[in-house]
């Protein structure tokens, strides 16, 4: 049985978070009415050396850094709220660890999102952050699913491999299959570099999207967990696989209902 990491009341419902990352919501009402965001995506920098052709953040090696140690909203965070810390290569931010320590003091659950190459090259650092309970989950953007990469990912219970609808290939999926891995499918964002890449390689992207659309049931059978952001849910029509009762049970809500986005680089926010 999964151990409980924490629980809290948010509006008219209770949230329970288990140590394997499972989240359970319970309410006696007809619908969930939150008072604050359960999950906050935080962009802390726009600096990255990977140059990904579809990068919707348009990150560059000389990108700006957010002033993350002087963010007043951090003081309003509640125990067991979740922060997904990302944007560029977060490991290049000199204030990352002090920021994570501040979140730990507030009992906030911090997760990191980073590129596969940055994860593999800095695995010792990542392991240290997990051992110190400065982070709990890691989201790893896939680039090359090697056996060595799979071996490394399997060491971390709360590691989730991120792939993009239209970028991930059939061969990638087959390589990752049957290793008890967790995968998050992100919708293709047609903004910034994503727009340019779509114009250049539209046929290739659409073919990959069609393969994924037609083979979703394969993923359900061959991965431990398959999850989606709301854009991927729409693009892949995930609702077709669920009964109304299942949809009501598993769907976590539209963007903005219990989520929030903060860009510390440009000092903007959105639901």
Which residues does each predicted region cover?
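N-terminal [4Fe-4S]-dependent radical SAM core
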Residues: 1-42, 246-247, 257
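Residue-level signal for well-ordered, solvent-exposed loop/turn and beta-edge residues enriched
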Residues: 12, 22, 53, 267-268
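A sequence-level detector of short linear motifs
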Residues: 25, 270-271
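Canonical Radical SAM [4Fe-4S] cluster-binding loop centered on the CxxxCxxC motif
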Residues: 30-69
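Residue-level recognition of short loop/turn positions
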Residues: 51, 87, 265-266
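Core AdoMet radical
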Residues: 57-68, 79-93, 103-122, 127-148, ...
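Ankyrin repeat (ANK) tandem alpha-helical domains that serve as protein-protein interaction scaffolds
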Residues: 71-76, 97-101
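Radical SAM enzyme [4Fe-4S]-AdoMet core and its adjacent flexible, acidic
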Residues: 133-270
């Amino acid at each position: 049985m999964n151990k409980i990491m924490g629980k809290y009341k948010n509006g008219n419902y209770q949230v329970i978070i288990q140590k394997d990352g499972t989240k359970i919501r319970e309410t006696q009402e007809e619908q969930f009415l939150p008072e604050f965001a359960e999950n906050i995506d935080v962009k802390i920098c726009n600096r990255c050396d990977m140059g990904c052709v579809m990068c919707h953040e348009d990150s560059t090696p000389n990108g700006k850094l957010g002033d993350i140690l002087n963010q007043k909203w951090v003081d309003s965070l509640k125990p067991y709220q979740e922060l997904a810390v990302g944007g560029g290569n977060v490991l290049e931010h000199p204030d990352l660890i002090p920021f994570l320590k501040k979140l730990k003091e507030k009992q906030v659950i911090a997760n990191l999102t980073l590129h596969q190459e940055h994860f593999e090259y800095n695995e010792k650092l990542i392991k240290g952050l997990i051992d110190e309970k400065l982070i709990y989950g890691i989201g790893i953007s896939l680039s090359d699913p090697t056996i060595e990469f799979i071996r490394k990912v399997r060491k971390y219970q709360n590691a989730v491999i991120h792939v993009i609808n239209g970028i991930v290939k059939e061969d990638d999926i087959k390589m990752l299959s049957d290793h008890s891995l967790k995968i998050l499918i992100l919708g293709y964002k047609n903004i910034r570099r994503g727009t340019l890449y779509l114009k250049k390689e539209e046929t290739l992207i659409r073919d990959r999207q069609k393969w994924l659309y037609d083979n979703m049931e394969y993923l359900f059978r061959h991965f431990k967990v398959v999850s989606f952001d709301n854009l991927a849910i729409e693009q892949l029509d995930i609702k077709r696989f669920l009964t109304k009762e299942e949809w009501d049970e598993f769907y976590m809500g539209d963007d903005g209902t219990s989520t929030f986005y903060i860009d510390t680089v440009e000092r903007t926010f959105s639901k």
